[in-house]
Regions:
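Glycine-rich, positively charged N-terminal anion/phosphate-binding segment
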Residues: 2-5, 20-95
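Short beta-strand/loop segments at the ligand-binding rim of alpha/beta enzyme cores
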Residues: 10-15, 68-71
């Protein structure tokens, strides 16, 4: 299978494991990476909850050292809040940020 390049990340193949709220938690991402997912993405995370440091939401960001690039998906409706959430996520140094566009 051909590799896939997204920005400065090169994935070994085009098989990826996308974000699913309530499903793609840390153990699930670890399992998918072990079975060859080119990258994994967090559950969908509320930008507003991140900005307000909601404990449950922040816990969704737990990274697993599984070798596959790991990204975070955020959603929201207020551009300023989305920007603040993206800045907050930057400190975690994930491979990429995915914005859910509806």
């Amino acid at each position: 299978m051909d590799s896939l390049k997204i920005g400065n990340i090169t994935l070994p193949h085009r098989a990826v494991f996308g974000p699913m709220a309530g499903f793609t938690d840390a153990p699930c991402r670890r399992l998918m990476a072990q079975h060859g997912a080119g990258f994994t993405v967090s559950e969908m995370v509320s930008s507003r909850a991140l900005v307000y440091h909601d404990h449950k939401t922040v816990s969704l960001l737990k990274a697993e050292p599984n070798g596959a690039p790991y990204g975070v998906q955020i959603f929201g409706e207020v551009p300023q809040i989305m920007g603040e959430a993206a800045a907050a996520i930057e400190e975690y140094q994930f491979g990429f940020l995915d914005i859910n566009m509806g």
